[in-house]
Curated annotation (Swiss-Prot):
Region annotated Disordered, chain positions: 933-959
Chain residues that bind ATP: K640
Biological classification of the source: Archaea, Thermoproteota, Thermoprotei, Desulfurococcales, Desulfurococcaceae
Protein name as annotated: Leucine--tRNA ligase
Xref: HAMAP family: Leu_tRNA_synth_A
Keywords tagged on the record: Aminoacyl-tRNA synthetase, ATP-binding, Cytoplasm, Ligase, Nucleotide-binding, Protein biosynthesis
Molecular function, one GO term: ATP binding
Single biological process term from Gene Ontology: leucyl-tRNA aminoacylation
Record-level GO cellular component terms: cytoplasm
Record EC number: 6.1.1.4
Gene behind the chain: leuS
Amino acid sequence: MERLKAVEEKWQERWREARLFEADPQPGRRKFFITFPYPYVNAYPHLGSAFTILRVDIMARYKRMRGYNVLFPQGWHATGGPIVSSALRVREGDPRIIKTLRDMGIPEEDIPRFRDPRYWVEFFTKAWRRDLERYGMSIDWRREFYTTSLNPAYSRFIEWQYLKLREKGFVGKGRHPVVWCPKEQKVVGDHDRPDEYAGISPQEAVIIKFRGRDGLVYPALTYRPETVFGVTNLWVHPDATYLVAEVDGEERWIIGEQAARELADQGHRVVILERIEGRRLLGRIVVNPADGREVPVLPASFVRPDLGTGVVMSVPAHAPYDYVALMELKRRPETLREYGLEPGVVESLEPIQLIAVPRAEGLLVVEEVRRRGVESQMDREKLDEATREVYAREFYEGIMLETTGRFSGLKVAEAKEKVVEWLEERGAALRIYTLPQEVYCRCGARTHVKIVEDQWFLLYSKPEWKALAREAVARMEFLPGHVRRDFEAIIEALRDWAFTHKGELGTPLPWDREWVIESLSDSTIYMAYYTIAKYTQHPEKYGVEPEMLTPEVFDYVFLGAGDPGEVSRRSGIPQGLLEEMRREFLYWYPLDMRISGKDLIPNHLVFFIFHHTAIFPRELWPRAIGVNGWVLVAGEKMSKSKGNFILLRQALDWWGADATRWAEVLAGADSGLDDANFEPSVADSAVSLLSQWLDFVRENYGRPARREERWVDRWFESRLNSTIARVTRLMEEANFKTALVEAWYKLQESYRWYLRRSGGEPREDLLRRFIEVQTLLIAPFAPHTAEEAWEAMGREGFASTASWPEPDESKISPEVEAAEETVQAVLEDAREVLSLIGGADTLVVTVAAEWKYRAVEAVRRARERGASMKEALREAFKVEGVDKREAARLVQQLSRAPEVLRRAAPRSVELEALRDAAQLLQEELGVKVVVETEEDGGSPRRANALPGRPALYAEKRGG
């Protein structure tokens, strides 16, 4: 372990000295610009963030070795409320935040310094950079910056961006529903809340008023107002406390406390009159405003008084929870008696079907509940699944029945809005915004929806902006490809976005400076800023002060607008430097790839696309997005309480950089949304295998060895070159786990087999080539080890900038590789045969008759043309000179063993391979091995031979 750490420190220092990863424009050379979302700097990096940035680094290193001029910059995100909130908590002496800092290893004497938000930013940007340097990231650090007004140069860039958006008509002002923290009195964006609450936004719902005989209003919040005609009762939680509140000075409502807060923050006057236990409401009678029917108030344990209004309208024909709760009450009359109700109150209540769905026999809700085996209203996971299925099918496929009166015959999607308008006209409904589930602020407070007046927002709902975003998505590459559909769907659903907050770190809105641009909105086109950050972040070198960065400067640099001489005169930036900045931007843009975690698809990545289309011409829109899942540790979500929360710096201390990188890749670093699973045992083994590889290189590179040609050399040379081709394709697809498995594990397996087949005597030039190729193929994954091996070979320069191996297509022979697979299969099968037949001293290996190869090839060609297996097998009967009975037997054999069709070795190659391997087979099996053909041999099992699958016969011959 210490040896590998010394190697890593050595090469990190060498890279720094050589300024190896600093990238400047080189006209005429292919460029590749790749980025990772800048992380929020209020804590140390953990294995999750390390996983995603590793995928960026691997792609950057690979492209560099492919000859590209690669730019991989990195900045830091400080915008938003969490840092301000944490600093305030330190000032207040909050023991939880003090403990968090201590647990991070912050010295006691330094904790008071965290009272200042600026110190948080400065401390954690340095910590992140140090950890990423130790991790082996190939970053151009000259372009480093952090966000907010603490960095005036970046703030000037953000101000320019929003002036352009306003100029183009993509910014508006008005009333807007936002997620609101009542404790900190601020808007709560995705970055202001724990990850599990990201992406949850206000949704419009409808409150339907059921008026009671007692003079109270029982308001039921629903997302399905069209089902009001099927209400059989109302639900309340018997053990919850409700409020009797005067709403808008007109009515007294029964509601939960969360609903009271939400109503008050959405323009309603709410006066709390008294509190009342839910059980006191049971048995009361209310009137359905849709049809005048009287229905009872009943108990249900699934009701959450803190969601919606706490009063639920029961539609058992179309809501799984309602159906199951009603059936439970019918089965358990003792529950009703417990609350002083007679069982007869539910006996007459039956589901009222309102909607017909194609292919549903009877009530869809009953079908889905039974299919999932739901037994009670506490089977929440199954009920949630059933609810999603029922709601989706009824919304998209359902037709309203005669039980809905004037709405009969309408599609559900059409009826929904018409029912709301009808109820509103009758004074029986109002619209409200709410959250579909509870959402907490990072400060720990429960949030709700508030209508903010005079709020600035981005007009993502504008048809012309959505059209641009759609066009960009159609032009882009996505890894994996199927996420394109997610982006398309989110673009369609995206609503206007409140982009300003108060009391946070960030950039003030240039025309209304009491507002600050929130964290997801100042992080959309900063990739463009990277291209000039080496100038703007270093006034000591280039003389560009923040106040010189006027909107006209950015107009020229990023859009080519204006005369550079005039812009220079007005800004004070030398014309030559302005033109150099413009050239630098045009060289690097557009962004070639952005790699991110899947959690940023619904917000950051979609915003990134929208903003690029709004500001830049089409030729400068992003080219590709790669997405990956999150990281589990030993199969479980990382959690401090479980003891499996691993910081990157801890991993680097325990295993070093390359072993940590290795284990992160094998955790699941292919393109896709599946979560990766980091196994500490894999990191342990990586420490050993990387050390062993360095020993192997030192002991074997350049040593004298065999020079004459053997059969197995052709196979290993083919494997070497076909591996390069496969790994190259996988790297282009960002399928890094599969690439590493091919590049290391399968190639090592091939080398071990090569050693066995060659009697421990590899050919000298192939041994050298193998060591070179193996080292270069693992260089993006374990760069420090690769550098050390490269130096041990006596090679010049760095492995990091050496040329990626190119496959020699003339040396790749699928036939030879298939023939050697046959040898390996024969060895494996023969062990099994000999273990079953004791006492045998001879193994007869029979290669199939020549006509079978021709027949199999005919069948294979037919399959490649798209013929069915049945049609393709008929081709076997058409081969010239084939006995029909023999062909029929072959067809039966192929039906049982279709894998034979995947083999590609001609008979002559297969026969040559087996005869060459006879000596190895004899040595490993301990018996005499005879290789013969089906035509000339005498084995009683010779007729069973198939191309690529020789027949084996063990016997005792003696002598």
